[in-house]
Swiss-Prot record:
Record region (Disordered): 1-23
GO molecular function: FAD binding; iron ion binding; iron-sulfur cluster binding; oxidoreductase activity
Any one Pfam family match given in the protein's UniProt record, by short name: Fer2_2
Domain FAD-binding PCMH-type: 221-408
Signal peptide (residue range): none
Transmembrane segments: none
Similarity comment: Belongs to the xanthine dehydrogenase family.
UniProt-recorded name of the protein: Putative aldehyde oxidase-like protein
PROSITE patterns xrefs: FAD_PCMH
Amino acid sequence: MSDCNSGGGERRPNARATDAPPVRAPSGGAFRCRGCGACVILIAKYNPKTDEVTEFNASSCLTLLYSIHFCSIITTEGLGNTKDGFHAIQKRMSGFHASQCGFCTPGMCMSIFSSLVNADKSKKPDPPKGFSKLSVSEAERSFSGNMCRCTGYRPIVDACKSFASDVDLEDLGLNIFWKKGDKHPDPTKLPSYTLGGGICTFPDFLKSEIKSSIDFNDASISSPREGWYCPKNIKQYYKLVNSGLFSESSVKVVVGNTSTGVYKDQDLYDKYIDIAGIPELSAIVRKDKGIEIGAATSISRTIEILNQESESTSSPNGSVVFRKLAEHMSKVASPFVRNTASIGGNIILAHKYPFRSDIATILLGAAATVNLQVSSKTLHVTLEQFLEQPPLGHNTLLLSIFIPHWASDCKKEHTLVFETYRAAPRPLGNAVSYVNSAFLGHVSLDKSSGDNILSNLHLAFGAYGTEHAIRARKVEEYLTGKILSASVVLEAIRLLRETIVPVEGTTHPEYRVSVAVGFLFSFLSPLCKGVIEPGKTLSISEDLVHTDNVHNMPLSSRRETLSGDEYKPVGDPIKKYKVELQASGEAIYVDDIPAPKNCLYGEFIYSTQPLANVKSIKFKPSLASKKILTVVSAKDIPTGGRNIGSTFLFGDEEPLFGDPIAEFAGQALGVVIAETQRYADMAAKQAVVEYTTDGLKAPILTVEQAVQNNSYFQVPPERAPKQVGDFSKGMAEADHKIMSEEVKLASQYYFYMETQTALAIPDEDNTMTVYSSSQFPELAQNVISKCLGIPFNNVRVITRRAGGGFGGKAVRSLHIATAAALCAHTLRRPVRMYLNRNTDMIMVGGRHPMKARYSVGFKSDGKITALHLDLLINAGISADASPVIPGTIISGLKKYNWGALSFDVKLCKTNNTSKSVMRAPGDTQGSFIAEAIIEHVAAILSLDANTVRQKNFHTYDSLVLFYPDSAGESSTYTLHSIFDRLASTSRYLQRVESIKKFNSTNKWRKRGISSVPLIFKVEPRPAPGRVSVLNDGSIVVEVGGVELGQGLWTKVQQMTAFALGQLWPKGCEGLLDRIRVLQSDTLNLIQGGLTAGSTTSESSCAATLQACNMLIERLKPVMERLQLQSDTVSWDTLISQASQENINLSASAYWVPEQDSNFYLNYGAGTSEVEVDLLTGAITIIRSDLIYDCGKSLNPAVDLGQIEGSFIQGIGFFIYEEHQTNSDGLVISNSTWDYKIPSVDTIPKQFNAEVLNTGYHKHRVLSSKASGEPAVVLGASVHCAVREAIRAARIEFAGNNGSGSSLLTFQLDVPAPMTVVKELCGLDIVEKYLEDLSNRGAASGN
């Protein structure tokens, strides 16, 4: 069995599962998606021959348990923990406010630790004390594969950069170690760091065991029934394969097992052959003509070898190939995947599947060959020949890859050129390419003309919609020997278009071909006289670092906050409550709760059809099917219960199971029960559902179909938004009109890091305890009790914390909790359900997609006189919370004074997954629609969009007209001052001019800038609170709200200290440490309500304050009596005396906001500048500036983190995140492979955020304001800036073909990913440019 040092101590796993389960760390790691990095661990391997230890980080969910035999495993708990003390990484992550929900934090810590350990091993000079050898640029890349949905990454970057030897401490963001603005921050105040990480990564006991087992030659490290085989050489491998022990269907050959991150296992395997230990497959052989790399060599190791080879190769011609290959490979996958994925495995995937491999393409461009072992024969074939072969069986091994030097083949008069390209959503990797290519050739000069001639060309293209990478041989043949000119390049591109033909069904086919054309143009243009080279910037904004590539700009930020003193410690930017536990992995989420005895596991079987009768559910014969214990379905609902999976505020319900009709693709049909979660997951994949549509109408999938079928949900009158003014009169006053224009907004998936999960434990007297990752435990209790037919007081729902929510765990979590409870009730055994990422994305829904059609009238100066909006909202199959969405959309729209506003909003019922609330629901879409209209008006009038925006800002009087119940007093209307301040601090006008200059001198890159205002209506909800003082003076606080990462517990802790501090002898010093905030428990504190809308923190604080005030009233008389005896009365003395006097030391309150008077508006604004690559559509966010009115912030550090994270999530919605479904409405962008949230390399290069502390307000909780949701709206500033850049591109390449109006006005829907951006910039701009050059050349006689 494997020995591992997990969590700092010796642990010996005793797994016997025949399917070789992934590593599951005792704590500090989690896995359900195979792509987010939350489960990253450090693996250390010991070589007894060299006495060397190699450390690397890896994704534990991809790492098979038996593959770490004789390895040492370090989780974040092994770095530091409560018992042994926390590591400097954990302390700095905590101190830089770099953890919110905390679910991703263990993986972040381990990625940073791995980078520090490996950097400190380098030959760089020793850094100053307390720092590492890591550089700032390396620090920024150290966690490029780790995803975070909460923070927006900036504080994580700061925490990591704090270790860098070249960091400027003044550039680091808000932290607890020094005050922001200190001219000379003291590095000694940072938690101490020891060079090398300060952790023993490989224990002596394990070294001894390894040394004693060197002569162990058996091919199996475990008993035959465990089925894990490790051949020590190729001969042993073939002996195993030919032994008759294996069948092709049940054996899996593995090296790193990372392929399962892309092509998920469809069944269990009963036998594995691990070939990573075969020396021949990891051998590195340097030859005269090149280098041979063993197929089992990791991609990371391959990069190291290539870099070494590029430095050692004598000829610069030869070194360029290895250097470029290494650079490109560093953008493949993520660091922790590259560490275990083998280069040969990547090529095998490219051979076996239509896998969009970068590595296969670039090696093909470098003319690599491969060595194969077929039984007793060794074959040498070109990579091109290998990729074209039929699939290989286990009797064929890929031995090695040979990459030629090229230097020896290059004549003196020739220059070797080699370039690689990729177009992908993320510049640093962790995203598959839309297109990739690699070009190699020899360049010589024509003696007569001095022009360049190409020879020995290799032009490789891949990922464009082909089975495998290819060489464009017709293009190679055409270009060989020709003098390069614009006309020659143009003809080559025409030939390329004939060659690069995506197969039917390829997404974005025209885009992929266009980008391939752009890559070839980028390669050839520097070799052509008179052709503008895409790769260089000709001028640059004064605001920017001077660089030819904005992708390489260093990340920087300015984070400004003001703290108030009147309510201390409320208002202080203290670190998050118990944040170190999140960093150390000790924070307990639902799946971390130890499985009770006899626990079973469940996974949903879901429909793949949108409207069909379910005739039967059967299972394919397979290993996984044999693991099924039972299937729980609607027939198992007990007498007195009912088929209910969720209920809503407006009386509607959604069934738990589709029975007998599946109403939408993704609807649960039953739950497979097995003894492990992996067994259950795999078994569910074996389900074969038979459907029939007899007697059923066609499904309604689109809003247009809903209109045709009159399929709508009703909006309660009290929730219906109110129109303003007389639309007809306003249109009559207009000088100009835009009639019936359209804009569409797609859905967005929540992508909380912790997927939906619940643990249900049946108890005596027909009771049930359910641990649920939920934003609405109270409603979960309601639905579970109705499903089981038992009273509410028989159901206890507990939520300690959730690993993110964003609205997705409000209503959509109820199905999982209810299903787990039903299974546990039926089987009388505990049942755990933890959805994998694919199932979660398919079943849970997301933000509401919609289509808006608007008509608007306006004056010549940009003043809008009237707006009418027709809005179709796709709500999905059930009402959920959708009836609130029309009101919030219109509320977001009303941020401008439209003069008169009318609308027709239809809430469409369709056969899709139910859409629910998601961060700033409705407001996000409504605000964007407003911006689209403003920008359209500005384009028609050829005015700066900000001029039109400000022209239509509300006066206080119009604000009251549009927001009659929440406008507040005139002194609280701060939008005008915020927008003016933002224009000044962001240098908006100066940058507009700089961008004009940039765009006029750069043909292939364009920039845009835009500002977006924010008005966001907030409606606080009631909340309970209880404060209890124990006899030792310690304090426990209970609130109904759930800690999701938004800092609720932190603010409640601060509020408790502020209130009880009146009786604390030394202000509040030391009081915070005496306060513990407890988990949500529906039988302990009732009426907990919904945690959503960014108001639960303040509502919980209000309830806590009321409860504290009750205690103070009881304790003050005791204090006064004690003060007669002594001037100073300690807290402990006070509590002891009160206890003796039988004073009730527990107080409960239920805070209810006053109707309307507690409603208020949030204000803010954001400015963003972007650069667009016209050849790929890639977007780089150069800079974003935010200013946000937070009232009197309860905790500026928490609020700033919420604002930044919310803004980045907004960027994801508006730009990056493509929510795609098939023709049946089934979600197909259902994994980290297909769905890309923002990552550290796609956030703004410069990110400045300022939190304003504005004045006193009697109706708000200590004058505070919400922070978690509103800033999503400001992400639209990036979308609007992209529109400006596209507009500049369209003007650049218009020629004589387009009118001014068609160039300036165009529909840019949401999201606007690089594929859409490129299409709008032009799919044929390279050809247009070359045609123009060729025509001009012909006219001049050249």
